[in-house]
């Protein structure tokens, strides 16, 4: 029975609107380059603030994909 080997790579993305958009941007960008993505784990969520206002929503994610 053959097994599978996966790899994990980290991506960071930001959005001025919300975390959901930042997550989608991270996934969409990873999906342009990586094949066989099987999952994505959000490792960290943070915001960048300036003058008492949120300027950017940021996510750090691990993208899991199966090696060919």
Language-model region placement:
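Short, well-ordered alpha-helical segments
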Residues: 3-39
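A cross-kingdom feature marking charged/low-complexity
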Residues: 45-68
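Amphipathic alpha-helical hairpins
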Residues: 2-5, 9-11, 46, 52-55
């Amino acid at each position: 029975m053959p097994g599978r080997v996966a790899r994990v790579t980290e991506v960071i993305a930001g959005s001025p609107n919300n975390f959901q958009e930042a997550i989608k941007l991270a996934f969409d960008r990873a999906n342009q380059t990586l094949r066989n993505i099987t999952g994505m784990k959000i490792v960290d969520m943070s915001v960048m603030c300036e003058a008492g206002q949120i300027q950017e929503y940021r996510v750090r994610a691990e993208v899991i994909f199966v090696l060919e």
